[in-house]
Amino acid sequence: MKLGIVGLPNVGKSTLFNAITNAGAESANYPFCTIDPNVGMVAVPDHRLDKLAEMYHPKKTTPAVIEFVDIAGLGKGASRGEGLGNKFLGNIRMTDAIVHVVRCFDDDNVIHVEGSTDPVRDMDTIDLELVMADLEMVERRIDKAKKAAKGDKKFLQEAADFEGLRDWLNDGKSARSYEDVDIAAEYPDCELLSLKPVIYAANLDEDGFSNPESVSYYCQVEQRAKEQGAQVIPVCAKLEAEIAELDGEEKKMFLDDLGVAESGLDRLVKASYTLLGLISYLTSGEDECRAWTIKKGTKAPQAAGKIHSDFERGFIRAEVVSYEDLMACGTMAAAREKGLIRSEGKEYVVQDGDIILFRFNV
């Protein structure tokens, strides 16, 4: 699963990406400093995995990961191919969801392409570019369906569905908010940009990050996101870049001094994981404790297949204990004595935080 970090030039995208991945992507104070997308695999924070590692002292601890792509700054005219628009939009098309970084601070030393800070305007600018790019694709889809309908009448419905969507997009509304037809379900091959789920990362200065609700820019972003049914995560990209350099104990002390329980980046990564409909199950032992990524609703054999195809092919059963039950008992042996380790079959839907031992035979 892949998330694209997007936003106008100079809103803090690359700084945020660098903090998330600890990768030194070029970050400079001028538009289009990130021409090729930078890709980073990011560990998903999970206290459950940390606790398992404390319990087992394994040789190796492997967290779940999620992929972030830093996509160069979009601007007005991107949907018409202006600037490097076509390249940027193509990079967004390859992602599963969007993290839209919005500037929520004033700084005369960091040039805004519009000359002023207005987060709602910036949100609308990017949203409109994605909608305009989708309109072009939808028009082509309608033409193709109408031609196909001459030989097969079933394509008439497809043409009608996309004509309804075209009218919606023409009003400047995203495909995400279109309810007449479930485009994603009915036409899964249609990769519309404005259909992708989105999280807004409100990039604040240090003072604002400690108390985002006191910042009018943040409140504006929050209100607009609420109208869209989207989530907003407050971050301070510059500060997060410093936090990312600290080890666990130093990081905790730093956050305590700021008066926040969790870094904005940790919240953003977790929220992104949830946005994609992902959960983690855990495996434990002296060799390795590991979090495995699956889609919510995945059944036990398919979850086992994430470890190895043989596990799925020869699946017999899954021995499952919930994280909460294991922590309450203190050891796996104690959980077994209390009858808290369940034997589940092929129809079992794996739950977030399940600790599983798969039995298989090939």
Q: Whereabouts are the PLM-identified features?
A:
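Generic signal for short, ordered secondary-structure residues
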Residues: S14, P31, E67, T117, ...
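Short, intrinsically disordered, mixed-charge
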Residues: N22, E54, G90, L128, ...
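Glycine-rich, flexible loop/turn motifs
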Residues: A23-P31, N38-G40, R48-K51, R80, ...
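Conserved Switch II/interswitch segment of TRAFAC-class P-loop GTPases
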Residues: G40-P45, A72-E82, R93-F155, W168-D182, ...
